[in-house]
């Protein structure tokens, strides 16, 4: 039985993720300038995270606490495959953002829009290949009991673990390099040239603000996934857990060892791991909320709200008072 606090935390994380993703998506389509900004690429991982939240949410209505629906083997495996695909795609999009940051640091004349087709091919194609490869052992060893498998899926564990660690390290290294270039002022000003010194300086300032936001998105994802990665490694390394499902063998062990002393010990350990896994899922979902907070710092977004009187009076009162004084003189 999961503790009430971990269950509530997971539910709160899911709701905040939903709010954050809808906030980004809504403003992306509402404000045209956001669709032409360097930070427009964040819309793709936002859609992915929203879909992940929706697909994983039915675990709340399951009779037994688990990451996956337990009503049928087919539905459970399909849900698990979608979740695996979405997490991989989310990470690859974060790598694409990091690659853009490297271009901003080292290739000032590069047109980043030309890379988007390649980004789409990698972000949607590579996860599909990984899911197909890692699901084959599950099809062979499936015991027909709702995502419970007879043996650990070594291919899935090692392949995903290596990929996730590599993606996270790459994102952190790029963030460090980008921060170094921001401090030194070695960033691309614009895709076009100009003879106006003032215009160039404005472009530099704007680019720096966008880059600061861009480098936060991959870092937020990597930080939010660290706990899940560590627990997945621990879970796989213990004899009580396999990689076929998040809590697969733990629940079976509870049923088999219910009346034994060793069973009680296993139950306590498994329950503790289940709580941590639920908490790690909640932390991962908070990525959507944190991304929305970063997105809120967009000058294009804030400029649009400044044009709305009620928001200008509440959040930019000084500017509203200054405008009123000018209107009075005029």
Curated annotation (Swiss-Prot):
Segments crossing the lipid bilayer: 11-31, 41-61, 86-106, 117-137, 157-177, 214-234, 275-295
A Pfam family per the record: Dicty_CAR
Molecular function GO labels: G protein-coupled receptor activity
Extracellular side: 1-10, 62-85, 138-156, 235-274
GO BP field: adenylate cyclase-activating G protein-coupled receptor signaling pathway; cell surface receptor signaling pathway
Gene3D superfamilies xrefs: Rhodopsin 7-helix transmembrane proteins
Membrane topology: Multi-pass membrane protein
UniProt keyword terms in alphabetical order: G-protein coupled receptor, Glycoprotein, Membrane, Receptor, Transducer, Transmembrane, Transmembrane helix
Superkingdom field: Eukaryota
Assigned protein family: Belongs to the G-protein coupled receptor 5 family.
Biological function: Receptor for cAMP.
Protein name: Cyclic AMP receptor-like protein E
Annotated source species: Dictyostelium discoideum
Gene designation: crlE
